[in-house]
């Protein structure tokens, strides 16, 4: 799509007007979905590793850019779900979630997660 150009010999306007007529870069919005971690915290919701894989596949097919899969140290089932999702070869970035404790971070690395949201509470009770 081309924009009309101002003929500066006929019309004088400020630079902001000229910039408004220039083609603008296309803006994109990325989606970070937390259903597999945060969604499972709702009362009565328990998802099997296979169900989490199906949800991750559906999110990927829907074009979600980043899927937060959870904390591998929360349970063996969560760790297994993360492994299944990583092995599925999805286009979306797969992100873990972890406390800032060394063992928790090492569990992310051991599974092969390349990115994570790291919770860093300031309360001694939560550390």
What function would you assign to each model-found segment?
Residues 1-46:
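N-terminal amphipathic alpha-helix/helix-capping segment at the start of soluble metabolic enzymes
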Residues 25-29, 63-65, 90-94, 112-114:
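Short, well-ordered coil/turn segments that N-cap beta-strands
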Residues 31-51, 94-101, 127:
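Active-site mouth loops of central-metabolism enzymes
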Residues 32-33, 114-124:
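Non-cysteine beta-strand/loop elements that form the S-adenosyl-L-methionine
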Residues 39, 59, 116:
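Conserved, mostly hydrophobic/aromatic
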Residues 48-58, 102-107:
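Short, acidic/polar
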Residues 64-90, 120-127:
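Glycine-rich, proline-tolerant flexible connector loops at the mouths of alpha/beta enzymes
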Residues 83-89, 105-117:
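Acidic (Asp/Glu)-rich catalytic clusters
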């Amino acid at each position: 799509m081309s924009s009309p150009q101002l003929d500066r010999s006929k019309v004088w306007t400020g630079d902001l007007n000229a910039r408004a007529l220039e083609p603008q870069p296309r803006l994109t919005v990325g989606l970070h979905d937390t259903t597999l971690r945060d969604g499972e915290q709702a009362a009565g919701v328990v998802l099997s590793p296979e169900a989490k894989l199906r949800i991750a596949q559906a999110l990927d097919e829907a074009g979600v850019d980043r899927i937060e899969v959870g904390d591998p140290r929360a349970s063996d089932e969560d760790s297994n779900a993360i492994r299944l999702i990583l092995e599925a070869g999805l286009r979306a970035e797969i992100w873990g979630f972890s406390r800032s404790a060394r063992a928790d971070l090492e569990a992310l690395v051991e599974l092969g997660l390349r990115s994570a949201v790291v919770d860093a509470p300031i309360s001694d009770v939560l550390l």
